């Protein structure tokens, strides 16, 4: 075992790969943790922070023991960049959080309101004044996973509608679609549970 650790293959290939993948793991966790903090998930963020630092210590300790190995430096930096990208991709797949959509229209507001209401979304309409006259402001609060559907409805009803999308840190009450939970932070753990259960099903077949 000692011979393998001291070999050139370990120092110039295996060790950098271990550092690379360790860095991917800890930066991915860190990226998701920061997103959870911005979403107000105060219970999930500390748990992720614990594992993030634990993996980081393991990676940096190997760097400090091999300061003359420049390949480890590249592996460390490449793992950081890759981990950031992977973390963003995972966060997009999880679609955690609540959004406020504000739509400003000067016509067809009744059709848009009706389409959104029939689709199960809560809608609030406010009269307002625009540069060129009277307009309607339509507000709806949705889950991030529903964004593409709502945008599609808006563009189908009024392709020239002006709309903006903002993050909602906290929402109290409101009308949400049936089956939508406000505690969507647990989807982070349910994602891995689903993959694990699907793997067990394949083994039992």
From Swiss-Prot:
TM region(s), chain numbering: 15-37, 44-64, 70-90
Record keyword Transcription present: no
Gene Ontology, cellular component aspect: plasma membrane
Principal localisation: membrane
InterPro entries found in the cross-reference section: DUF2179, DUF5698, N-reg_PII/ATP_PRibTrfase_C, UPF0316
Membrane topology (UniProt): Multi-pass membrane protein
Annotated localization: Cell membrane
Keywords: Cell membrane, Membrane, Transmembrane, Transmembrane helix
Record keyword Transmembrane present: yes
Domain of life: Bacteria
Family affiliation: Belongs to the UPF0316 family.
Record protein name field: UPF0316 protein Cthe_2213
């Amino acid at each position: 075992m000692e011979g393998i650790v001291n070999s050139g293959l370990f120092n110039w290939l295996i060790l950098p790969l271990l550092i690379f993948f360790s860095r991917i793991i800890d930066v991915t966790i860190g990226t998701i943790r920061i997103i959870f903090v911005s979403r107000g998930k105060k219970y999930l963020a500390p748990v992720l922070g614990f594992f993030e630092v634990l993996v980081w210590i393991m990676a940096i300790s190997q760097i400090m023991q091999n300061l003359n190995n420049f390949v480890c430096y590249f592996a460390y930096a490449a793992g950081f960049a890759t981990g950031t990208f992977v973390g963003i991709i995972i966060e997009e797949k999880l679609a955690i959080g609540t959004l406020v959509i504000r739509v400003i229209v000067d016509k067809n507001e009744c059709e848009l309101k009706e389409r959104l209401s029939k689709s199960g979304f809560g809608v609030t309409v406010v009269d307002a004044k625009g540069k060129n006259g009277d307009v309607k402001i339509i507000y709806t609060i949705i889950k991030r996973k529903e964004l593409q559907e709502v945008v599609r409805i808006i563009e189908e009803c009024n392709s020239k509608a002006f709309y903006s999308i903002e993050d909602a840190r906290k929402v109290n009450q409101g009308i949400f679609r049936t089956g939508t939970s406000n505690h969507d932070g647990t989807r982070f753990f349910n994602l891995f549970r689903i993959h694990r259960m699907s793997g067990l099903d394949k083994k039992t077949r």
